[in-house]
């Protein structure tokens, strides 16, 4: 993502570069916000001789007051729907699709938290390209790390199940199927193999033999669990601290654990009103907000008080996000307890 902020006009122009950029955009836009983009409208022309109408779509620049956003995880488009507020089509409904390569102009005075949030995408700190293969003797799951979640890429069965599994199971074919699926994923720079039993290490050795993976950093870790749980646990382990500790999901996991650990000591609080009171007292060190609460109008009141405080926006699509939502979407870690 590239952004250009005009302080005088209170506009932000965004060049969308990746799929993940769409998630960031979704979380700073709300109904009522104004955007500018290119829409394709039909112009009617009357043929005087045939008295018929023909139509064609032409690109026009329009300003839209947003009514709704349609964002689907792991897709390359976001759909913005609203009402045109200027020009010949003023008052008419319009939708615009945005994806990588498009430019979006927002007429909005972004607050400090929203700017910091967009700067994550600008710095490309959590770019895609990190793949996890989590497996055991029965099945393998392949995940692509996104900024906001793990994307399911493939599920491969080994056929090593049932009383007569030995008639169907072929370990070599199992590994070949996994490797074939991995080769279909583009722009990978880090591949992490994890899981239980002997299969993860065997797969790792097969991958290392394949010249296709020569330019990819391949790692192997034994874990106590498989699937997404295995990946989440690995993200927060000391074993990977020097490799993936700066991933967004690893940070979310650490922040959540600190919040939960401090609940018993009174150094963690939750709930909008409770946090609002602690902000007034200057006692909050870290403010943790769920993705959907970040977009709420009342949240801006909290953020206006939170200057200089560490703020984390937690994705809805992760385990930490689900837990933060169960606490009402507003959580905080305190500098000190107030009696």
Swiss-Prot record:
Signal peptide: none annotated. Keywords: Cytoplasm, Endonuclease, Hydrolase, Metal-binding, Nuclease. Its cofactor is a divalent metal cation. InterPro entries: eFR1_2_sf, eRF1_1_Pelota, eRF1_3, Pelota/DOM34_N, Pelota_arc, Ribosomal_eL30-like_sf, Transl-rel_pelota. Gene3D superfamilies: 3.30.1330.30, eRF1 domain 2, Pelota, domain A. GO terms for biological process: nonfunctional rRNA decay; nuclear-transcribed mRNA catabolic process, no-go decay; nuclear-transcribed mRNA catabolic process, non-stop decay; ribosome disassembly; RNA surveillance. GO terms for cellular component: cytoplasm. Pfam families: eRF1_1, eRF1_3. Its EC number is 3.1.-.-. One of its GO terms (molecular function) is endonuclease activity. Its main location: cytoplasm. Monomer. Belongs to the eukaryotic release factor 1 family. Pelota subfamily. May function in recognizing stalled ribosomes, interact with stem-loop structures in stalled mRNA molecules, and effect endonucleolytic cleavage of the mRNA. May play a role in the release non-functional ribosomes and degradation of damaged mRNAs. Has endoribonuclease activity. HAMAP family: PelO. The N-terminal domain has the RNA-binding Sm fold. It harbors the endoribonuclease activity. This is Protein pelota homolog. It comes from Picrophilus torridus (strain ATCC 700027 / DSM 9790 / JCM 10055 / NBRC 100828 / KAW 2/3).
